[in-house]
């Protein structure tokens, strides 16, 4: 499965648009509590543990996106948008969402 933020894939023609696909992953409140409790993990202004959790959530969202596209018979997803948003009544969770258009391509 190919993923692209652009509307086309270089060297390939889109032969069919299969539909919009999405993927989401939510990081619970524990990641924020752990993040602030482990603030000493920050090196050079960055937290390795927090970045690792965000990366994991993004990978889960992309996996869901790919599974939806595959179920539609697509071999690529184009026009991908990645969003990060706080959710929950007190904003204690972070949602990573990805969306794009599932397509069939030909070289």
Curated annotation (Swiss-Prot):
Entries under InterPro entries matching the protein: UPF0145_dom_sf (IPR035439), UPF0145_YbjQ-like (IPR002765)
Domain of life per record: Bacteria
SS bond list: none
Pfam families listed in its UniProt record: YbjQ_1 (PF01906)
PANTHER family in UniProt: UPF0145 PROTEIN YBJQ
Family stated for the protein in its record: Belongs to the UPF0145 family.
UniProt-recorded name of the protein: UPF0145 protein YbjQ
Organism encoding this protein: Salmonella arizonae (strain ATCC BAA-731 / CDC346-86 / RSK2980)
């Amino acid at each position: 499965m190919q993923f692209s933020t652009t509307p086309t894939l270089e060297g390939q023609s889109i032969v069919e648009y299969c539909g919009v696909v999405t993927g989401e992953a939510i990081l619970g409140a524990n990641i924020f509590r752990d993040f602030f409790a482990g603030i000493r993990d920050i090196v050079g202004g960055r937290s390795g543990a927090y970045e690792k959790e965000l990366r994991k959530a993004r990978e889960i969202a992309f996996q869901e996106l790919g599974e939806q596209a595959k179920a539609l018979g697509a071999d690529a997803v184009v026009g991908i948008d990645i969003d990060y948003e706080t959710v929950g009544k007190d904003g204690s969770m972070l949602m990573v969402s990805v969306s794009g258009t599932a397509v069939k391509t030909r070289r």
